[in-house]
Amino acid sequence: MDAIFEPRSVAVYGASRDERKLGHTLLRNVLTGGFDGRVIAVNPSGGEILGVRAVSALEEAVDLALISVPAASASAAVADAAGAGCRAAIVLASGFGETGPQGKAVEARLAEIARAANMRLVGPNCIGVVSRHRDGWLNGSYFWRLPDPPRKVGEDGGSVGIVSQSGAFGGMFFAEARRRRLGVARFLSVGNSVDVTESDALEWLSSDPATSVIGLFAEAFREGRHFVATAERCQKPIVVLKAGKGGAGARAAASHTGSLAGRHGAVQAAFARAGVIEAASSDEFFDVLQALGAISPAPGRGVAVLTISGGPGVLASDAAERLGLRLPPPGEWTARRIRHLAPEFAAVGNPIDLTPQCPPASFPAAIQAVFDEPAYQGVIVINCGLDIPEFGQGVVAARRRTGKPVTAFVLDVPRIESELAEAGIPLLSSPERAVAAYAATARGLSPSGQGAP
């Protein structure tokens, strides 16, 4: 698996001079993403492509062979890579097991060739791998637009590892990662998984120092028991978005990756046993990854809803109770501090509504008082339209001093949104989603509020 995520040399089968072909895109992505290892192009015509020497057949072993050829030529390419001693190969073509029995037979042949050579095989019917590499990316995929890499691993999160059975879902993930400023460490599309499965990738990511949170998009689990056992051993949060839950979805999954979706009730029970967080929707999946990628898991369920917006604060409180969070009132000493700083009509319960009339200079101290309260293991911040710099500054400073996890909903205040985002505070698109993302970080909770064992 090291050769897949951290290769030192790469061969691109199907590399083409024709800019319209996917083999050209793949080679260009490898060359321009920031990978500084050895790159070889494999093309029957030989010569040179994009400044890289091209060979008709691989003459030496490389760590990773990226195979972008039609399905009919895939077996020959895999055999060539295996014969040269490659450690791993990724077959990006489609037209295999998802098409029926004949395609499944071709898949089986690919797996047989790889197994005989002790070469790991990803795919077929996948979109490739994206992995942090020094200050850039190993972009062994068809994705042409990736997030800007952090200046160093761990900065800006730099922490989420994604395994997806769907290549197109990877496009959704990278678009959301850019929009949410989500730190990304690794991405692997496993496709039809004739050899490398989501469980294999999960096991590798579990011990990867660059990955702190793991996300998985799956239409079905081919090795359900292996996956559950691997998830149980994993010491990192795992968030799963499971497709193919209903009859129509299961049929679509079968035609897409040639897999069986299984009974979702049994899948949910297995997730619960393994402590896996299951997201109910793609929005929830990305919300939870955003929260877990930016903040440490909350040590408990006691939370403060800190707001200057009455109605949205109540919505957040309703969601918190529904999801199993506790909303204790502040202790008497904390309440006195807040009352001394906020208007007399401020609500000093939970939610704690400082009101827009709070003197700007008082916001930092009042916010710090909330964060200092021992009953609160974390804080959910709500601000609808109050453009007072001291509010954002107070939240950032209090979070930095206490280290308590925070999620936020900020509406129509770009200056404060930017300040909180720069500080690594997850910004969600509604009060309820801010609460749900926080709840996923709380020990023993899932986004739906169901307790995990």
For the regions a protein language model found, what residue spans apply to each?
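Catalytic-core regions of core metabolic enzymes
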Residues: 1-453
